[in-house]
């Protein structure tokens, strides 16, 4: 069965606390942390971007997959913060991991679900027999305007998945999607920061689509929340994540391992892939995982995944998320603003 052959993740080591941002804008940090269920977020260093995050994650995925990168037939990088408007991130990743030029590669965009869209595309190509392995990455160095609510959550990170049919560590048993034209969040070409619909981003956007894809998955597979060991969802903040998990009948024991936002913020295209990676870091053979992404604009992709025996053989070939986050450095707002290019000089 087609599934995950290897996975890898990367999160920058810099962090900024909610209190530090709130101090600059005169906001109440306790109210913000409680409302968003976010305490701090990751910050990309001056030498980090979507490309470097993608490369690190891809290399770790290869370490676990134990395959020749020359056998990868497709590379997709999903992000809304590609460094170049015209120059693919995917080709740079391909060169960095020493993949063959005999492949198809593309940068994907669908707000925060571009990474899972890449996984679906790779699954389709592998199942069709067109390629042996596909590499799908979801990564971002997300943006939030100074003083905007997004500034408390917009962060950086990503995860990579190698999809194939042989020696899988987890089978992707089913996938489905739910998509509509919903203008909840957008950024035009040339704009530094996105615009969003405030409360409109909740019920008619995030919840409608995540629940739409999730309920479709449960119906098509004939399963309920009780049939899964773990669940992970897109996490623009901790509040939405917990609410949608509970609406679907999942317990804290099922959803807490995939909830990373309180300590790293919203990694956008990396959010659901990173949450899934966190689950794979501890999952046992036979465990069943329910995963649903979300991207503004708007749509959700859902996956039913079952973990295989091989995961215990290769899990320690690369750093786990716990190890990646073991060494962090806190920065003040001035350093954060400098790293993120928020200070513009004429």
Curated annotation (Swiss-Prot):
Pathway: Metabolic intermediate biosynthesis; (R)-mevalonate biosynthesis; (R)-mevalonate from acetyl-CoA: step 2/3. GO terms for biological process: farnesyl diphosphate biosynthetic process, mevalonate pathway; isopentenyl diphosphate biosynthetic process, mevalonate pathway. The active site is at 80 (proton donor/acceptor), 112 (acyl-thioester intermediate), 234 (proton donor/acceptor). Keywords: Acyltransferase, Isoprene biosynthesis, Transferase. SUPFAM superfamilies: Thiolase-like. GO terms for molecular function: acetyl-CoA C-acetyltransferase activity; hydroxymethylglutaryl-CoA synthase activity. Disulfide bonds: none annotated. It comes from the Archaea. Pfam families: ACP_syn_III_C. Its EC number is 2.3.3.10. PANTHER family: 3-HYDROXY-3-METHYLGLUTARYL COENZYME A SYNTHASE, HYDROXYMETHYLGLUTARYL-COA SYNTHASE. Catalyzes the condensation of acetyl-CoA with acetoacetyl-CoA to form 3-hydroxy-3-methylglutaryl-CoA (HMG-CoA). Functions in the mevalonate (MVA) pathway leading to isopentenyl diphosphate (IPP), a key precursor for the biosynthesis of isoprenoid compounds that are building blocks of archaeal membrane lipids. NCBIfam families: HMG_CoA_syn_Arc (TIGR00748), PRK04262.1 (NF003274). This is Hydroxymethylglutaryl-CoA synthase. It comes from Methanosphaera stadtmanae (strain ATCC 43021 / DSM 3091 / JCM 11832 / MCB-3).
């Amino acid at each position: 069965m087609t599934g995950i052959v290897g996975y890898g993740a990367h999160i920058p080591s810099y962090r900024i606390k909610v209190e530090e941002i709130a101090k600059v804008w005169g906001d109440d940090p306790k109210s913000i942390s409680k409302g968003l269920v976010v305490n701090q977020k990751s910050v990309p260093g001056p030498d980090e971007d979507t490309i470097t995050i993608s490369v690190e994650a891809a290399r770790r995925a290869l370490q676990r997959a134990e395959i020749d990168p020359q056998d990868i037939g497709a590379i997709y990088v999903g992000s809304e913060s590609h460094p170049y408007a015209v120059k693919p991130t995917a080709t740079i990743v391909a060169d960095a991991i020493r993949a063959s030029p005999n492949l198809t590669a593309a940068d994907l965009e669908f707000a925060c679900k571009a990474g899972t869209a890449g996984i679906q595309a790779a699954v389709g190509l592998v199942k069709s027999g067109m390629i042996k392995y596909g590499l799908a990455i979801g990564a971002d160095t997300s943006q939030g305007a100074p003083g905007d609510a997004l500034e408390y959550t917009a962060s950086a990170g990503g995860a990579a998945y190698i999809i194939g049919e042989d020696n899988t560590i987890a089978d992707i048993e089913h996938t489905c999607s739910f998509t509509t034209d919903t203008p909840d969040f957008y950024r035009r070409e040339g704009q530094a920061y996105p615009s969003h619909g405030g409360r409109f981003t909740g019920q008619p956007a995030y919840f409608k689509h995540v629940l739409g894809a999730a309920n479709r998955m449960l119906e098509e597979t004939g399963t309920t929340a009780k049939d899964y060991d773990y669940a992970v969802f897109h996490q623009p903040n901790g509040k939405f994540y917990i609410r949608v998990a509970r609406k679907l009948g999942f317990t804290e024991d099922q959803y807490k391992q995939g909830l990373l936002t309180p300590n790293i913020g919203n990694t956008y295209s990396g959010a659901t892939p990173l949450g899934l990676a966190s689950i794979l870091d501890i999952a046992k053979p036979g465990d069943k995982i329910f995963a649903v992404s979300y991207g503004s604009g708007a749509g959700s992709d859902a996956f039913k995944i079952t973990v295989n025996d091989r995961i215990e053989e290769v899990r320690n070939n690369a750093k786990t998320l716990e190890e990646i986050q073991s060494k962090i450095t806190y920065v003040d707002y001035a350093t954060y603003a400098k790293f993120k290019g928020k200070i513009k000089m004429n």
